[in-house]
A protein has these predicted regions:
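Noncatalytic, basic helical substrate-engagement surface that gates or grips nucleic-acid strands
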Residues: 2-148
């Protein structure tokens, strides 16, 4: 099989992609609610598809309590991360409203992705990077080019 015939799978650490878009894109709905997580994620996806021309796209989300196993092995796991600083010129939501909006945008993004030819994977207590590592080793994707984001 030549490189031009080689199939390509796009494996996306979805929460990472979504949070980057959420933090950086200050877009608002007509009602003034932040929507940059959705808009930015879809724009990033559009660019990734255009640039990599994948045969399959898989969004892998961190499962609920995904970090707990690693945190139990290493109490400092992810402890050195800086707090999120949003790219917003106007703070129109309380911290609680901001958290609700962040979750709402993520759920809406997942709904939108369900309408596309995209597989989404969420496994309780497993982080996305572990699932991505597993998928790269599965027989289905043997011989495929893997694009990991």
């Amino acid at each position: 099989m030549t490189n031009t015939e080689q199939k390509r799978v796009l494996l996306i650490d979805s929460l990472n992609l979504y949070l980057r878009a959420y933090i950086m894109d200050p877009s608002l709905t007509m009602q003034g609610e932040p929507c940059g997580g959705i808009k930015g994620s879809l724009k990033i996806l559009q660019k990734l598809v255009r640039d990599s021309n994948p045969d399959e796209i898989i969004f892998i989300w961190d499962g609920p309590n995904g970090s707990q196993k690693r945190k139990s092995l290493n109490k400092d796991y992810k402890s050195g991360r800086k707090p999120i600083r949003l790219n917003r010129s106007v703070k129109n939501l309380t911290d609680e409203e901001e958290m609700q909006n962040k979750v709402w945008q993520q759920m809406r993004l997942m709904e939108y992705l369900n309408e596309m030819p995209i597989m989404q994977i969420i496994i309780p207590e497993v982080e996305a990077d572990d699932v991505i590592s597993y998928l790269t080793q599965t027989p289905k994707y043997r011989g495929w080019q893997k694009v990991i984001v």
